[in-house]
Amino acid sequence: MNQVNNVVNFNLVANVTKFLYRSLYLILAAALASAAPAHAQERPAPAPAPAPAPAPAPAPAPKNAQPVTPQPDGSHLVPEGVKESTPAPVENGSSDNNAAPVPEGSSLPEPAPRPALVDTSINPNPPFTPGSMQSLEMEHEGKTRRYLLRIPNHYSPEKAAPVLFGFGGWGDSPENYSSYARMQTTEANNEAIIVYPEGFERAWEAAPYAKTRDGEDIRFIKRILDSVDKDYHVDRNRVYAMGMSNGGGFTSVLGCHSQDTFAAVAMVSGAFYNPVEVNCADAPMNTLIMHGVNDKMMTYEGGDRHEAGYLPVRTVLGGYLKRNRCDMTFQSTPEAGGSERLSFNGCQKDVQLVKVPQDHTWFWQPDTPNVVWDFLSSKTRV
């Protein structure tokens, strides 16, 4: 009986010992496996996914124009630092502040007229008669473009005629703009070849809704001028531009980039979106700005419209004052309808601002077509 118990005890001890050895082996094997490099493992753990590369920062969008806060004294209506000056009285009725005194009993000589630039390509038999207006088309950079051409009542191949370009607002047809511009009430009707171009899809460059870019519209206008010059006696020294709203903004683009072509520009209720003042040529330009201080569409103080910023009037004016090297002072004179005209001093070329107590429109008071033509027609390029 004792022998049987001894055998049982021996077998039990052997089994326990065998179990302990096997457990110790498995523990050591697991420890070694976890310490082995990944390539030595049977099923290597997947490498951790790399951290996603940070997305590139978007290019900064052009800063929207910062609206100007209206001031009770009206100082927000002119560029910062510009002040009204009181000219010293000048004898003999001269309006030139810098003129030398004229001896008593003598008079100022009449200034010599500037000669018109010679036009050697005059057609003695132009295609359209004086007083007529035609709708014309041309292919330009893959687009069919249209414009109205009006020949002045007093046109003669023997006398060089000024050229006036007129640009309507967004959505305006040339016919519509030529109607409300009322240039037939001015001497331009008798003197000037008037061109009313149509914007592509009735919009002009620099506005966010325009379909033209990178000077396409500027080149279109210069092609029209060259075409007109082939058939008519054009005074290249007296080429002018005027515009309303979006057309006023584009007129400012011409005033900023085409001083080699235009003698003077006039902007009425201009839509001065930010690109209007980008990369302007540093050259003077005779400039008239007329804007309603109560304009609710393109506010005088600047703001945002069509998800784009537009400039305060005083910022656009300030650009012309700088390029004309004005001395940042002005004289103020009253105009019809409670308007005020600011004429700036010391400029290489004439710069004027007419502040009108009205909304976004081509004004009746003051009489916009005559104010515009009286200003433009007195200017020459050289």
What are the roles of these predicted feature ranges?
Residues 4-25:
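Bacterial N-terminal signal peptides that target proteins for export
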Residues 40-51, 55-163, 242, 246-264, ...:
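A domain-start/cap signature at the N-terminus of enzymes
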Residues 134, 138-154, 158-240, 249, ...:
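Serine-hydrolase catalytic machinery in alpha/beta-hydrolase-like enzymes
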Residues 199, 266-273, 292-295:
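Active-site nucleophile loop of the alpha/beta-hydrolase fold
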Residues 300-311:
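Short, flexible/disordered intra-domain loops and linkers
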